[in-house]
Amino acid sequence: MIRFCSARLIQRGLHTAVAKPVMATSTAASRAAASKMAGAQAETGVVGSRLVPGYGRTLTRALGGQVLEADTEGGGHVMTEGSVDWRRSFHGLGAKPFAAPVQEELARALEPLDIEIKPDGLLYLPEIKYRRILNRAFGAGGWGLAPRSDTIVTAKLVTREYALVCHGQLVSVARGEQDYFIDTGIPTATEGCKSNALMRCCKDLGIGSELWDPVFIKKFKKEYCMERFVEHLTTKKKKKIWLRKDREVEYPYK
């Protein structure tokens, strides 16, 4: 509750002055105002007299219910005559096979040194190796990933659909996904989402197809991999992990 004290007349010699009303604030009102100010600081990110935009706001509130990347339709995107809108088009899908040299490069067996294995025993090809194979087959600039949807951000996941276009024709469409743990990790997760979509699209070209062949997987593990009991340095828990025979146990295991 706010009270206003009555004005007082002050006589000083020949002059008369009117004192301004004095505003007195009750203790309860002071506490309420302080609480409101603290809430505003947490919301807007005010630190002392500085305003730090964006801090203290949740991702959901910051996006305002919108997706991370807005649809470009009608937003200044101009399609020239003869161009293809890869967000919707299936231009060239299954229209014609690639030249024989391209197919030979795509079907080439993977080098054993290029294949990695995860601690749980899953074989995989690093994402950069997929890009190198595409560059050898189609040439640098002869292929690309075109987004087919908006970037969807959930509480723990980033996902987006991409199309792989090679020599002007659609080859494959796949949805990439990537987990994240804090809001500042979203930009990195969007790149991981793109890499995941690239790997899935390359399956339709036959790149690294042996990684899904049970016979090859068993043979590769027997020749190039081994299982070892290790201890986690932090939790001190012991477990069995897979690793290549030419590799050493790395952190966080010993």
Swiss-Prot record:
Keyword terms: DNA damage, DNA repair, DNA-binding, Mitochondrion, Mitochondrion nucleoid, Transit peptide
GO MF annotations in UniProt: DNA binding; single-stranded DNA binding
Transit peptide region: 1-32
One GO BP annotation of this record: mitochondrial genome maintenance
Main location as per UniProt: mitochondrion
Top-level division of the source organism's lineage: Eukaryota
InterPro entries per UniProt: Mgm101
Cellular localization per UniProt: Mitochondrion matrix, Mitochondrion nucleoid
Family: Belongs to the MGM101 family.
Summary of the function given for this chain in its UniProt record: Performs an essential function in the repair of oxidatively damaged mtDNA that is required for the maintenance of the mitochondrial genome. Binds to DNA.
The protein, known as: Mitochondrial genome maintenance protein MGM101
Organism of this sequence: Eremothecium gossypii (strain ATCC 10895 / CBS 109.51 / FGSC 9923 / NRRL Y-1056) (Yeast)
Lineage: Eukaryota, Fungi, Dikarya, Ascomycota, Saccharomycotina
